[in-house]
């Protein structure tokens, strides 16, 4: 009988996780796994059926934590699933695990209790934890009152002088959009005002108008950004999955007030700077002390940790320093997608995380492959002249996909912000990140990963320019509402140019 893994959530990573669990072929750990989507988006069941993906779906009454908990408890009790991986952090932050703990089912969930979800849900508390256990973070960080502009100004000016930049962070859950980078003195007030405008309501809901509003300010870190996903079981065994690199800025170039951090515009795996020495550094400097902290604070349980880091390296590509930017407690979107498309035994790894024997299950990685994920997002325009993702988006427009063409070109399409009209039999956009396009390429040893990445980018660009993936604007039936970053994957080329004799 198949071991059934539920993935609870609504976005693209949720569906792809179920697809990979059901279809990936392991060489060592068996293949009898079934992926199950808990909730998903309305477009996903008909989309999966049209693609003949062997994925099952479990509905929920609504998108609340209570509805998820009810559906998951029923599914675990009736055998529809054997375990569950919550995908969005809000489910854990709102206490999903606590609900399952009340009925004796918490050992079937990967994640933390509401109390211990502070690792992601409270960045200031997480910084204190890292400091206590010598997990490297930014050289300087301060917890200040968001209502005290004079202190914020003074702190930012010092950090600009010493580190060339400062980062303001709303310290609570913000969907990956709570960081604001300041690169010069002129930006301080405008960036501060924008952050307060975006999160003032959230602050008031948490603390009221008269209390202090916690704000995290960090020194800007240099180096390259790199992400890791670590599975940890109840005994403290762990496995580090392949690396990824996120493209969080809306447009190419550094983040700024005009180029905001989004939920993610795309991702690649592996990171161009991935090396065996790097995995050793991560295990020693981050994972081992973090597990020690979890054990000593009675937090150790089946979980998934996702630290975003800054990496420094020498001219031989050897890692010299790594610092944690933040730690998340769920699979990232979209970084999770290219990672799991390179793993043959996702189901076995998740099962081992639940059962406590991760030391016996090694990730089977397609080490000869690179994978690229590109988010197709809602662009500008619409009835109210919307600015497009990540600002304001029009919805309800027809999605037009040439499935035969995309299958021929081996472009995998994952629906995300997409609905389905059963009466009309059509898919419609629902704003934000509508579709993810995933492509993989095998790279022969000694050959250029940059050239392979360029071929993959051209696949997606050609499909887009030829109208093979469209959201049809109401005002222009021949147009395309979708937009995307055309530079996803170019860091393979940049790495080869930087270290031509090594990469």
Regions found by a protein language model. Name each.
Residues 428-503:
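Generic C-terminus detector
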Residues 204-216, 293-308, 358-371, 463-491:
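Flexible, glycine/charged-enriched surface loops at secondary-structure junctions
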Residues 280-307, 328-408, 412, 421:
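Active-site "cap" helix and flanking loop/linker of ATP-utilizing ligase/carboxylase catalytic domains
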Residues 1-112:
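ATP-binding N-terminal substructure of ATP-dependent carboxylate-amine bond-forming enzymes
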Residues 219, 267-270, 374-375, 433-445:
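Short, well-ordered beta-strand elements within core beta-sheets of diverse protein domains
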């Amino acid at each position: 009988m198949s071991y059934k893994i539920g993935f609870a959530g609504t976005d693209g990573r949720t569906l792809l996780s179920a697809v990979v669990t059901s279809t990936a072929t392991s060489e060592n750990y068996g293949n009898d796994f079934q992926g199950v989507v808990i909730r998903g988006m309305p477009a996903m069941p008909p989309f999966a059926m049209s693609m003949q993906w062997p994925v099952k779906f479990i509905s929920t009454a609504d998108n609340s934590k209570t509805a998820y908990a009810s559906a998951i408890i029923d599914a675990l009790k009736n055998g529809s699933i054997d375990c569950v991986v919550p995908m969005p952090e809000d489910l854990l932050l709102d206490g999903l695990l606590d609900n399952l703990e009340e009925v004796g089912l918490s050992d079937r969930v990967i994640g933390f209790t509401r109390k211990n979800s502070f690792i992601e849900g409270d960045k200031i508390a997480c910084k204190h934890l890292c400091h206590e256990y010598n997990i490297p973070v930014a050289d300087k960080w301060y917890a200040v009152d968001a209502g005290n502009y004079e202190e914020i100004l003074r702190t930012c000016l010092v950090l600009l002088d010493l580190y060339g930049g400062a980062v303001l962070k709303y310290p609570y859950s913000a969907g990956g959009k709570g960081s604001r980078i300041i690169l010069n003195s002129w930006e301080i007030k405008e960036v501060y005002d924008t952050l307060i405008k975006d999160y003032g309501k959230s602050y008031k809901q948490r603390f009221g108008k008269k209390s202090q509003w916690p704000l995290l300010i960090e020194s800007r870190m240099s180096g390259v950004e790199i992400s890791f996903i670590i599975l940890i079981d109840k005994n403290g065994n762990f496995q580090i999955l392949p690396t990824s690199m996120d493209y969080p800025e809306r447009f190419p170039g550094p983040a700024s007030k005009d180029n905001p951090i989004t939920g993610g515009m795309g991702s690649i795996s592996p990171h161009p700077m991935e090396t065996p020495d790097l995995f050793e550094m991560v295990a020693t400097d981050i994972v081992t002390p973090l597990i020690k902290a979890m054990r000593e604070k009675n937090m150790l349980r089946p979980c998934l940790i996702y630290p975003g880091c800054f990496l420094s390296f020498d001219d031989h590509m050897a890692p010299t320093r790594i610092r944690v930017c933040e730690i998340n407690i769920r699979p990232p979107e979209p970084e999770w997608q290219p990672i799991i498309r390179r793993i043959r035994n996702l189901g076995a790894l998740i099962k081992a995380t639940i059962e406590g024997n991760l030391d016996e299950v090694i990730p089977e990685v397609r080490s000869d492959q690179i994978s690229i994920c590109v988010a197709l997002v809602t662009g500008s325009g619409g009835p109210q002249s919307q600015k497009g993702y990540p600002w304001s988006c029009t919805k309800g427009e027809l999605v037009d996909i040439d499935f035969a063409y995309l299958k021929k070109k081996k472009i995998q399409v994952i629906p995300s912000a997409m609905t389905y009209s059963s009466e009309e039999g059509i898919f419609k956009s629902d704003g934000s990140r509508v579709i993810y396009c995933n492509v993989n390429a095998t790279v022969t040893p000694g050959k250029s990963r940059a050239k392979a990445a360029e071929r993959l980018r051209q696949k997606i660009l050609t499909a887009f320019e030829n109208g093979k993936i469209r959201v049809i604007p109401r005002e222009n039936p021949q147009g395309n509402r979708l937009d995307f970053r055309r530079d996803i994957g170019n860091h393979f080329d940049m790495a080869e140019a930087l270290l031509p004799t090594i990469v």
